[in-house]
Regions:
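N-terminal secretory signal peptides
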Residues: 16-62
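Sec-dependent signal peptide recognition
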Residues: 1-6
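Active-site-proximal beta-strand/loop segments in catalytic clefts of secreted hydrolases
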Residues: 34-36, 64, 86, 118
Length: 124
């Protein structure tokens, strides 16, 4: 029974957004970066070198705070940065987002960069 329910969920059509004109449907990706030891200057250099060339149409960068349960059960806490990027969903964009994540992990010695994807109705 569980297998049938899972199969039905996988084959069900995705719900389309009902965007009201002049809004149009766009994909949204949130990238969440640990910023514990990353200076403001290093962050801006990273944005200029790795992010802006891949997403020249624009993005939003936010400062935040994050916490999670680390190995051993302790709560780890650190400053965080969040990028919000609205874009067309395609393989080239996915590759660009993954390249940004990889570059950040390598440059700043991070274990991960969280990625959250969704859809929004967008108008300017």
């Amino acid at each position: 029974m569980r297998a049938i329910a899972a199969l039905l969920l996988l084959t069900a059509p995705a719900c389309a957004l009902d965007c009201k004109l002049p809004a149009k449907e766009m994909a949204r990706t949130e990238l969440l970066f640990g910023a514990g030891t990353v200076s403001e200057s290093a962050w801006h250099q990273f944005l200029s070198r790795e992010v802006t060339p891949r997403f020249p149409d624009g993005l939003t960068a936010l400062e935040g705070y994050g916490q999670w349960k680390a190995d051993g059960g302790t709560i780890a806490k650190e400053r965080a940065r969040v990028l919000l990027i609205w874009h067309s969903p395609d393989e080239k964009t996915d590759a660009a987002l993954d390249a940004i994540r990889g570059a950040y992990k390598k440059q700043f010695h991070q274990q991960s960069v969280m990625r959250v994807d969704g859809e929004d109705c967008v108008s300017f």
